[in-house]
């Protein structure tokens, strides 16, 4: 039994075994020029009656459900009262439920993308390095476990130095619990808009330049407490992972070897390029 989802539907890898309920559709911002996830949808908050009916139906077929993920990208855009209503009903209908999550919840992703204001402006992220640090600081004070995502190559060749230097600085100030580094890949449907909003020629990085950025990020990211670091997304040239600062030297040694042996890199067709 599967719900009649409004596709496309996304969830983090960690939610592969979770039951998914779409309490919102699309993204309320939906202006990041590099992102195509919800461009085919207009943001909407689903009616409680529809969500309730789906919970009722799935609780009959899967009463032992232990994990639930609330989609789409902006479940937390619901009002507090709406969220409480959904959560209370989920725990009522699924007596073995242990965890309910959504994008921007603890241990899920917060897309920083870059710490450089110029890059953030050019990709219409709607944030600055300072505002990102402030938002993350508020979340940390309230007990959130922060998992932050950045995008290698987002500054192109022109802004590669500033992109990585400022991203490492922001990450060091934020002190997240997890960091995921992806590599820029534009869906063909996003290419023209990305280039137009960038407002100047954009040169994509080659694989060696992406490794250079990853190397500089690991070198300059100076967390005060241990941070789980992952560059193992499908878009990455190779899976590099560890805990900073303890595994810094090991990860840098791996990157050095990859530069010497480019044949070890993941073929582009396996990265969706």
Sequence positions of predicted segments:
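Hydrophobic faces of well-ordered beta-strands that scaffold small-molecule active sites
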Residues: 19-21, 66-68, 98-102, 110, ...
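Conserved, mostly hydrophobic/aromatic
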Residues: 27, 35, 51, 70, ...
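Active-site glycine- and acidic-residue-rich loops that bind
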Residues: 108-109, 124-129, 155-168, 208
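Alpha-helix-loop-beta-strand connector modules within alpha/beta enzyme cores
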Residues: 83-100, 129-148, 174, 201-224
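Auxiliary Fe-S-binding modules of radical SAM enzymes
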Residues: 1-15, 169-273
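Canonical Radical SAM [4Fe-4S] cluster-binding loop centered on the CxxxCxxC motif
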Residues: 5-50
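Conserved SAM/AdoMet-binding glycine-rich loop
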Residues: 59-141
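Conserved strand-turn element in the central/C-terminal portion of the radical SAM core barrel
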Residues: 107, 115-119, 139-163, 182-189, ...
């Amino acid at each position: 039994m599967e719900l009649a989802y409004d596709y496309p539907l996304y969830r983090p890898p960690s939610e592969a075994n979770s039951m998914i309920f779409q309490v919102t559709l699309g993204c309320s911002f939906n202006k990041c020029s590099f992102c195509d996830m919800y461009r085919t949808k207009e943001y909407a908050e689903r009616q409680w009656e529809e969500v309730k009916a789906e919970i009722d139906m799935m609780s009959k077929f899967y009463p032992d459900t232990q994990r639930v993920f609330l989609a789409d990208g902006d479940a937390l855009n619901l009002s507090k009262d709406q969220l409480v209503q959904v959560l209370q009903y989920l725990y009522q209908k699924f007596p073995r439920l242990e965890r309910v999550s959504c994008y921007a919840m603890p241990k899920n992703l917060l897309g920083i993308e870059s710490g450089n204001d110029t890059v953030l402006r050019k990709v219409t992220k709607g944030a600055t390095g300072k505002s990102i640090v402030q938002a993350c600081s508020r979340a940390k004070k309230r007990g959130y476990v922060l998992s932050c995502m950045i995008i290698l190559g987002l500054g192109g060749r022109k802004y590669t130095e500033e992109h990585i230097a400022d991203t490492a600085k922001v990450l060091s100030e934020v002190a997240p619990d997890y960091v995921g580094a992806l590599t820029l890949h534009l869906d063909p449907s996003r290419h023209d808009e990305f280039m137009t909003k960038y407002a100047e020629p954009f040169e994509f990085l080659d694989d060696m330049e992406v490794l250079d950025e990853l190397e500089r990020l690991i070198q300059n990211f100076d967390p005060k407490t241990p941070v789980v670091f992952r560059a193992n997304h499908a878009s990455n040239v190779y899976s590099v992972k560890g805990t900073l600062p303890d595994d810094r030297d090991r990860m840098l040694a791996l990157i050095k070897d990859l530069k010497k042996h480019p044949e070890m890199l993941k073929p582009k067709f396996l990265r969706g390029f």
